[in-house]
Amino acid sequence: MRWLLPLFRTVTLAVVRVRRGVCGLGMFYAVRRGRRTGVFLSWSECKAQVDRFPAARFKKFATEDEAWAFVRSSSSPDGSKGQESAHVQKLQVKTSKRPREPLGEEEEPPEPGAKHTRQDTEPAALVSKDAFSYMGESVVVYTDGCCSSNGRKRARAGIGVYWGPGHPLNVGIRLPGRQTNQRAEIHAACKAITQAKAQNISKLVLYTDSMFTINGITNWVQGWKKNGWRTSTGKDVINKEDFMELDELTQGMDIQWMHIPGHSGFVGNEEADRLAREGAKQSEG
């Protein structure tokens, strides 16, 4: 978990937990002294570490930053401000070097004559569970997408998925089909979930710097489906096939979507970005 520590500096973070049919409250259970120390996503996970453990120290927090501060410190920071029922928890964004990403429904214009190409899925050998990094019982993964000359004829897009240092599932590949940044972000998440399913992983903490992807899958997609895959203004959803694929992949998964600022020095995000850029250099298969 050492390589995850830079994450726990004061950063902008939006946390969304989605499980089909269940909306999580996003509370964080910090264990400073117990069978295992760290931050857990449910009381049952926390209880297993502290129940009947001598002089156990643990506390519930509304934010991940506070929880990790409690784990690392010798004295407790201010505790939880109480449960929040909001679907998405947001802390104020301070800086991000990436240009502003459209946050409205489908702001990206379609590329004329472009076709959607579904990614092929390939069988994968099972990887030891010890090779993954965990937050509670959930496996941690970082995804990123990139596109040079976005929206132009010579655009080149790639996707990156980063599971940890030297991990065999780390991948950077060229995005098939229409070459845009938003499609790359969506399909990076698709790739990570596909890999997770192949490893029999059902609980994920998925870090992405794309609020467009997070909003799309946790917010907009349900409304689009009810509206015949049209936006609230009656327009066709530009990335319909991409979100349909992502929506299908999330079925049966317990995914906590976490937003992290892009290009701000966080190792997991920087590595996913590097893999995406390497993927964009590949020829389109």
Curated annotation (Swiss-Prot):
Residues at which Mg(2+) 2 binds: 144, 273
Domain of life: Eukaryota
The species this protein was found in: Rattus norvegicus (Rat)
Cofactor(s) demanded: Mg(2+)
Gene: Rnaseh1
Protein name: Ribonuclease H1
Major localization class: cytoplasm
Job description of the protein: Endonuclease that specifically degrades the RNA of RNA-DNA hybrids. Plays a role in RNA polymerase II (RNAp II) transcription termination by degrading R-loop RNA-DNA hybrid formation at G-rich pause sites located downstream of the poly(A) site and behind the elongating RNAp II.
Range of residues in the leader sequence: none
Binding site for Mg(2+) 1: 144, 185, 209
SUPFAM superfamilies: L9 N-domain-like (SSF55658), Ribonuclease H-like (SSF53098)
